[in-house]
């Protein structure tokens, strides 16, 4: 009798994706983050669903409904903090996942990579509208400042911002539509993630060497299922340490003050995972220039396949490129730090230098280093 998992129309899809999938025998723990992102997404959808059962998207009651969830709903506090800190874990996994793709040249899978970039944008949009929902001070002012950036678009900017707001300022209409967006976007992310996986399985996974591994494949189950479960346990351990011991570590104290349009917080800043882009935005004195730099800081990822000048796919055997890659990581950490600092000397200068460094590394230095390495191979 033929195994049902190989013949049943639905189970066949699951089997080909998670059980009998031929996987390279040498993929390291950096390949765990795709499955961890899947776990994060499921966790966020589930906790978000339970939060939505008690949340009200009205400016008068939004803040108190979140307080009600934490105080009066059974285990509401843990659901709320798992959702808030789950977003941070999501972005940590995302950044590592993208970094892995850059390091090992996974961007040569064009469709998979471009859908991944769209996914990154969608997750960032979801996190942004989600941050507005508790209707604290930073929620309100973050929404005002970031949506206002669109007014820099020539000719249609002001109309576009007022259309997004649903009025002449961030108000009830804005909060209601942001809640609607925050509810629907995770399902769009799920569909995109499935497409991402579909295109990945057309080519098969990359591996640390960047060399085709067709002659050396092993079944995904049990080898990588066990490996993924270990990663999942570590992820949940770190998440629960955050939730149970320091739930507000990554949040902003200003968000425990109800939104007040008449009082501006001293330092308006987004959540930590947007700080690198926020620092790039602030480092340019011109509004439109800043908005373009902000968009380009992520869009530059779509250029990676075009900027790949090396004869080797992976950075595993390219010490010069490795060095520049880790400088890029340090630069992003610097930008993240600067984004959380007030706009004053010396932070302005550091931010501008780090922003120049960011684009120089990706657009000029790394392709140049790859060409130097190509020439070294001829020696």
Swiss-Prot record:
InterPro entries, alphabetized: Cyt_b/b6_C, Cyt_b/b6_C_sf, Cyt_b/b6_N, Cytb/b6-like_sf, Cytochrome_b, Cytochrome_b_C_euk/bac, Cytochrome_b_N_euk/bac, Di-haem_cyt_TM
Cofactor needs: heme b
Alphabetical UniProt keywords: Electron transport, Heme, Iron, Membrane, Metal-binding, Mitochondrion, Mitochondrion inner membrane, Respiratory chain, Transmembrane, Transmembrane helix, Transport, Ubiquinone
CC terms in the record's Gene Ontology section: mitochondrial inner membrane; respiratory chain complex III
UniProt main location, coarse: mitochondrion
Binding site for heme b b562: 83, 182
Residues the record lists as binding a ubiquinone: 201
Additional information: Heme 1 (or BL or b562) is low-potential and absorbs at about 562 nm, and heme 2 (or BH or b566) is high-potential and absorbs at about 566 nm.
UniProt name for this protein: Cytochrome b
Gene (UniProt): MT-CYB
């Amino acid at each position: 009798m033929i195994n049902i998992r190989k013949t049943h129309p639905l189970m066949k899809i699951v089997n080909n994706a998670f059980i009998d999938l031929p996987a390279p025998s040498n993929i390291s723990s950096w390949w765990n983050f795709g499955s961890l992102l899947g776990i994060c997404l499921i966790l966020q959808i589930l906790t978000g669903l339970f939060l939505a059962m008690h949340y009200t998207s009205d400016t008068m009651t939004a803040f108190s409904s979140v307080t009600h969830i934490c105080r009066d709903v059974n285990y509401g506090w843990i659901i709320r903090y798992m959702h808030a800190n789950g977003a941070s874990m999501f972005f940590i996994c995302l950044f590592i996942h993208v970094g892995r793709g850059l390091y090992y040249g996974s961007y040569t899978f064009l469709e998979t990579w471009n859908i991944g970039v769209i996914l990154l944008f969608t997750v960032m949009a979801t996190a942004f509208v989600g941050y507005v929902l508790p209707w604290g001070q930073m929620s309100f002012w973050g929404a005002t400042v970031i949506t206002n950036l669109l007014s820099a678009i020539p000719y249609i900017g002001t109309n576009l911002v007022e259309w997004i707001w649903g009025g002449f300022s961030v108000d009830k209409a804005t909060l209601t539509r942001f809640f609607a967006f925050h509810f629907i976007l995770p399902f769009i992310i799920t569909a995109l993630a499935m497409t991402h996986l579909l295109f990945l399985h057309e080519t098969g996974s990359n591996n640390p060497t960047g060399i085709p591994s067709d002659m050396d494949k092993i079944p995904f189950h049990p080898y990588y299922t066990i490996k993924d479960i270990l990663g999942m346990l570590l992820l949940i351990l770190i998440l629960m340490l955050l939730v149970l011991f320091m739930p507000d570590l990554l949040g902003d104290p200003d968000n425990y003050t109800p939104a007040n349009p008449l009082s501006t917080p001293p330092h308006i800043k987004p959540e930590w995972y947007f700080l690198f882009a926020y620092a790039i935005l602030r480092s340019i004195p011109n509004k439109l220039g800043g908005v373009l730099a902000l968009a380009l800081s992520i869009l530059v990822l779509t250029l990676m396949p075009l900027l790949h000048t090396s004869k080797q796919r992976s950075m595993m055997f390219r010490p010069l490129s490795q060095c520049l890659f880790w400088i890029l990581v340090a630069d992003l950490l610097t930008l993240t730090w600067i984004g959380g600092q007030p706009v004053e000397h010396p932070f302005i200068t550091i931010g501008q230098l780090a922003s120049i460094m960011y684009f120089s590394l990706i657009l000029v230095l790394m392709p140049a280093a790859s060409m130097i390495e190509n020439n070294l191979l001829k020696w």
